[in-house]
Structure formats: structure tokens, C-alpha cells
């Protein structure tokens, strides 16, 4: 099980402050305090399918339930900040408006987060946080039926 092998389990998720596509300022994990939250993080456009594979099933199962939250966090190097309006505009056009509040694009020092979480930026990553922002599950790349079951089971246990 992930709890036995992953050093991130039990750690507080590092703070990310950024603007959502709905143009609200969000600070993760604080913006979701009191909720069980899936945070899906990607550093490459090519990882989008991986995030969708985690977020889609989670949102389908928990998205309308009270006490749950989810965020998709594209992490973009500060060097692309000058393209922010074009990048965010493209994402807004391609993502349904009701999902905009859940997409929080961070422009900045991405290496800070890859080091803090000891993750490989070539993959998308899914972090399930408890109500206090502590990491209780972590997945990388595409999920399989077993990892989705573990994610769901962990979320349901946290909800009790």
C-alpha cells in the first residue's frame, strides 16, 4: 500500500497560491480546508491525459458530494509568465465554465514543488488530501483499477 512506501504520505501538501481560470485567488491546501481534496498536478501538456484519468473518476464519484473538493494544477515555469493570458485563455476556451474554479494555474518556480514532493515532472501526479491538507494518497502517471480503488477507499475512509 502507498502508506508504507511513499514518504509524502502524512506530510502537509506544500502551499500553492495562484489564480483559477474563474479568476479567483486560491491557496491550496487552505482554500479546501475542511474538505477531502484531490489535487492533480502536471508540469507538461503531455500529462493532461494522466490528470483527466484521475480527476474524471474522482469527480464522477465524489464531485457532487458535500465535503469533497478537487483541483487541477498546471505548473508552468515562470519563464512562460509573459504568455499567461494566452495560455489561460486557451485553457478557458477548452474547459467547461463550471470547471474553471477547479483549474488553478501556477506560474513560478516549479522546481520548488518537484523537490518538496520528490516527484518526477515527466508525469502527472494525484494527491488526496485530508481535511487538514495532509497527503493521504499519491498516484503517478495513469491510474489502473487497483490505484483508483485505493484512491476511492482512502477518500471514503477520510469521509467517515
Model-derived features: positions:
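N-proximal helix/coil linker or "cap" segments that precede and/or mark the start of modular domains
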Residues: 1-14
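A short beta-strand-turn-helix
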Residues: 16-36
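Loop/turn elements at helix/coil->beta-strand transitions in domains of secreted/extracellular proteins
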Residues: 34-36, 66-69, 124, 131-132
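Structural cue for short, hydrophobic secondary-structure segments
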Residues: 38-42, 72
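Solvent-exposed loop/turn segments at secondary-structure junctions
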Residues: 45-47, 76-80, 110, 135, ...
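Structural microenvironment flanking redox-active thiols in thiol-disulfide oxidoreductases
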Residues: 46-96
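Thioredoxin-like thiol-disulfide oxidoreductase module
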Residues: 79-122
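Thiol-/selenol-based redox modules, centered on thioredoxin-like
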Residues: 115, 121-160
Amino acid at each position: 500500500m502507498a502508506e508504507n512506501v511513499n514518504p509524502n504520505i502524512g506530510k502537509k501538501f506544500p502551499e500553492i497560491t495562484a489564480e483559477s481560470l474563474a479568476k479567483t485567488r486560491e491557496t491550496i491546501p487552505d482554500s479546501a480546508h475542511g474538505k477531502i481534496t484531490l489535487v492533480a498536478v502536471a508540469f507538461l501538456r503531455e500529462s493532461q491525459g494522466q490528470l483527466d484519468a484521475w480527476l474524471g473518476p474522482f469527480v464522477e464519484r465524489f464531485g457532487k458530494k458535500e465535503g469533497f473538493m478537487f483541483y487541477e494544477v498546471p505548473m508552468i515555469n515562470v519563464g512562460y509568465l509573459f504568455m499567461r493570458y494566452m495560455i489561460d485563455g486557451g485553457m478557458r476556451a477548452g474547459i467547461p465554465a463550471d470547471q474553471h474554479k477547479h483549474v488553478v494555474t501556477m506560474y513560478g518556480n516549479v522546481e520548488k514543488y518537484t523537490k518538496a514532493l520528490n516527484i518526477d515532472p515527466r508525469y502527472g501526479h494525484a494527491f488526496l488530501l485530508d481535511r487538514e491538507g495532509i497527503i493521504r494518497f499519491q498516484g503517478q502517471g495513469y491510474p489502473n483499477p487497483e490505484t483508483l480503488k485505493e484512491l476511492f477507499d482512502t477518500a471514503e475512509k477520510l469521509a467517515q
